[in-house]
Amino acid sequence: MWRIFGLILHENPLTYLDPSLKTFHLEAIRSMLTRHHIALYDAACSVRRLDGNASDARLEVVEPTDLESLLQQMSECVAVASTGGRSAEVLSRQLGCARMPGVGASVEVTAFGRRLLFFRMPSSSRAYPMKLERKAEAYRRMLMETGCLNV
């Protein structure tokens, strides 16, 4: 995820990484997210990985996140985005999506008493078979459409 944001905002995928420590610059990431009015949260509070790997295909969602409760705390939120197949399934059910958007696309939904855009983004995982530049372009379009790059 942070390589994507580094590429979008700084034209450098390593901006938010500290290669010497093999970690991320947490305070810089928090500052960037706050500055651009971006909130992040998992689609599920509890999951079970059935094969012990990161694949969505064998991921059981034990407890989905209470999206309605989260959105009640963010009155200015205009969009919800998923970053993978399983999260898209979980969130689309909660949002009452009539149809799932294609990867990199969005649909407008009315959920929890408000209109929202629901984006189905490509997985940010390096294991997802899409070039980083293409992922960044999809995320850039989403951030532009939601106004997050205009702040």
Question: What role is predicted for each listed range?
Answer:
Residues M1-R58:
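Short, surface-exposed acidic-centric catalytic microdomains
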Residues M1-W2, K22-L26, H37, P64, ...:
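A structural signal for well-ordered alpha-helical scaffolds and beta->alpha junctions
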Residues I4, D51-E68, R93-V151:
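C-terminal capping/extension of enzyme domains
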Residues N12-P13, V78-A79, R99:
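Secondary-structure boundary/capping signal
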Residues S31-L33, Q73, A111:
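Generic structural signal for beta-strand residues in well-ordered domains
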Residues R35-Q94:
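Internal catalytic-core helix/loop-beta-alpha segment
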